[in-house]
Structures are given as structure tokens and as C-alpha cells.
């Protein structure tokens, strides 16, 4: 298994070096009027997670091209159409669309823009339209951890152990702050301000704040102590004696605390562990279940979209309205009115 991982990683690095131009943008590198410092800064215009996603997407396309004996850079429109039609046999429409975006962005970085960009060709757009019509674009997503789920989990944490205290703080804070898992593990002790009303968390960067303006998220004390994120967080920090650095960290089997940051994948594993202990199907849940659960629960409590967005930090109402529709799927059901007649 280790050898396989190393081979995959070495292949990934080779692909980036050979033809993933978003790391080393040709238009930037070949511009003699730009200073080296300016070039390096321009190369950071896209978020790291975006670049990683594009790199994986491009690697898949490049492998497909190599297998079929066709050129990936520059690719022909026909090559892209053939690729996405093969991809659509198993992948969702949204995945196919993201791959086309990655192919397009990489061609732009290599200097193929406008009408010279094969991913913008009318043939590719027509193929994508057909795939969307055939497969649809609805994303099911993971099940939400709702407010009532928090009560269900409350007695499952072993608070005699550091891991139990950490896991409780992580889950309840993740829900209360509607955090993405990457945001949750990046929170530093220095980002916290405790007040008589609760805690304010400063986020320097997030998916919705790519320019780094910074955002503040307020988490008030909950009247119900058993589901209070602020109390759980304070107990965890006090017991673990964390006074600087990442607030969520790995813990060894002998309950020894490490100084490094918890990985975002660990958030999903922790969530799955406790929903499984509660008798729920762990395969239906993931790290995003906390963020989705907050939005869905808020909708069920008739909280308006703008108020929900202040906590979730969504920049568009589209996704929030989708959560509201899902949260009220039974409340606004026509059958309920018929049954009550």
C-alpha cells in the first residue's frame, strides 16, 4: 500500500511538472516586464485547495489522453468531447463540468485563451448541455446533523478522556459556527475572544473569503448546557491546557496531546464515529454534515435566509434557499394540509 501511494504521489508530481501550467503560468513566466516578486504573487491568485482540485482533474484528463494516444496540451475540442463522454458514463454532471473548467483554466495558463481555448469551443458546450440534461445536476450530499441529533450525541462523549472532550467541542462548535471542516481545523487559540455572551472566532481566510478580508463568527452560550458549544470548547481548552496554536489537535492512543493541527479528514472520521455510536448509518454522514445541519435546522426553526447567511457566510442565497427547502420539506407539504382538514 505504501509503495502504491508513493507511486501515485510521484506520478502526480510529474504531471504538475510536465503540463499543469497553473503552477507555472506561461503568460506570467514569459512576461519580461514583471519582476520575479510580482510573478510569484500572481501565481498565488488562486486558493491552494482550488489548485489541488484542478491538478487532480487535469491529471485525470492527461492520463486519459496518454492512454488514447492524443495530445492534452493543447487539446482539440474533439478530444475534450470524447473525454467528457467517457467520464459521464460514471461521473455526475457537476464532476464533468468541473473537469472542463480545469481543462479550460490550464489552457488559459498555457497561453491558449479566447477562441484558441478548446474547452470554450461550441462543440464542448453542446456536449456539456447534453450531459446535464441526461444526468441532471442535483447533488444529494451528506445527511445533516440536526439540532435533535446533538441531543442524541450528548451522552456519547467520554469526558474522562482528552479525546472525548476534543470530539465534543469539535462537533458542537462545528455545528454552531456552520464551519467547513477545513475552517474548523485551522482555528487558532489566538483567533478566540471569550465574552460574557459567548465566544467570537476570527477567521482570516475561508472559502467564501478568498481575498482574506477576515470574518467574525459569534457563538453564544446555549441555554441547554448539554449541547452548548462554548462550554464544550472552554472545558476542552482548559483541560488540554491549550493557550496558543491550533485548538484541535491529534491525540495519541495513550491520550497524549500533539502540537500539530488536526487534519480535515479527521473531522469526518470523528463525526462518523459518534453518529455510528448513536445508531445512525455513519456512511450517510461526513464533516460537511455539521455545516449543512446548522443551515437545515435553522430553516426548520423558520429563521430567514439572510440571518442564516450571516452564520454560514454564504455569499449567494441559492444554496441557503436549497437548505430552507429541504428543512421545510414536510412543513410545507400539501398532504399535511389535506390530512388536517
Curated annotation (Swiss-Prot):
InterPro entries named among the record's database cross-references: CB (IPR044068), DNA_brk_join_enz (IPR011010), Integrase-like_cat_sf (IPR013762), Integrase_catalytic (IPR002104), Integrase_recombinase_N (IPR010998), Phage_Integrase-like_Recomb (IPR052925)
Residue ranges annotated for the Core-binding (CB) domain, each copy included: 21-111
Record-annotated Tyr recombinase domain positions: 140-336
Gene3D superfamilies: 1.10.150.130, Intergrase catalytic core
Gene Ontology molecular function, alphabetical: DNA binding
Superkingdom per UniProt: Bacteria
Alphabetical keyword list: DNA integration, DNA recombination, DNA-binding, Viral genome integration, Virus entry into host cell
Gene: xerD
Protein's name according to its UniProt entry: Integrase/recombinase xerD homolog
Amino acid at each position: 500500500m505504501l509503495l502504491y501511494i508513493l507511486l501515485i504521489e510521484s506520478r502526480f508530481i510529474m504531471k504538475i511538472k510536465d503540463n499543469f501550467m497553473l503552477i507555472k503560468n506561461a503568460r506570467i513566466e514569459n512576461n519580461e516586464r514583471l519582476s520575479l516578486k510580482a510573478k510569484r504573487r500572481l501565481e498565488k491568485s488562486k486558493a491552494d485547495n482550488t489548485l489541488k482540485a484542478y491538478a487532480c482533474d487535469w491529471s485525470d484528463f492527461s492520463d486519459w489522453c496518454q492512454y488514447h494516444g492524443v495530445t492534452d496540451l493543447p487539446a482539440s475540442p474533439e478530444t475534450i468531447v470524447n473525454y467528457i463522454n467517457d467520464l459521464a458514463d460514471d461521473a455526475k454532471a457537476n464532476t464533468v463540468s468541473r473537469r472542463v473548467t480545469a481543462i479550460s483554466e490550464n489552457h488559459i495558463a498555457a497561453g491558449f485563451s479566447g477562441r484558441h481555448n478548446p474547452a470554450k469551443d461550441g462543440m464542448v458546450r453542446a456536449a456539456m448541455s447534453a450531459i446535464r440534461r441526461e444526468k441532471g445536476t442535483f447533488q444529494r450530499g451528506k445527511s445533516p446533523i440536526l439540532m435533535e441529533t446533538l441531543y442524541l450525541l450528548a451522552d456519547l462523549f467520554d469526558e474522562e478522556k482528552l479525546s472525548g472532550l476534543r470530539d465534543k467541542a469539535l462537533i458542537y462548535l462545528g455545528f454552531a459556527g456552520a464551519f467547513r471542516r477545513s475552517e474548523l481545523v485551522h482555528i487558532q487559540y489566538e483567533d478566540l475572544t471569550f465574552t460574557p455572551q459567548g465566544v467570537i472566532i476570527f477567521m482570516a481566510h475561508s472559502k467564501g473569503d478568498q481575498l482574506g478580508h477576515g470574518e467574525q463568527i459569534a457563538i453564544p452560550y446555549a441555554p441547554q448546557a448539554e449541547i452548548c458549544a462554548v462550554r464544550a470548547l472552554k472545558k476542552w481548552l482548559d483541560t488540554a491546557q491549550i493557550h496558543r496554536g491550533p485548538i484541535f489537535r491529534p491525540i495519541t492512543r495513550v491520550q497524549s496531546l500533539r502540537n500539530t493541527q488536526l487534519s480535515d479528514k479527521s473531522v469526518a472520521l470523528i463525526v462518523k464515529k459518534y453518529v455510528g455510536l448513536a445508531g445512525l448509518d455513519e456512511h450517510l454522514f461526513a464533516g460537511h454534515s455539521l455545516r449543512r445541519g446548522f443551515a437545515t435546522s435553522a430553516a426548520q426553526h423558520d429563521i430567514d435566509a439572510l440571518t442564516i447567511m450571516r452564520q454560514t457566510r454564504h455569499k449567494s442565497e441559492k444554496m441557503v434557499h436549497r437548505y430552507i427547502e429541504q428543512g421545510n420539506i414536510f412543513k410545507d407539504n400539501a398532504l399535511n394540509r389535506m390530512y388536517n382538514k
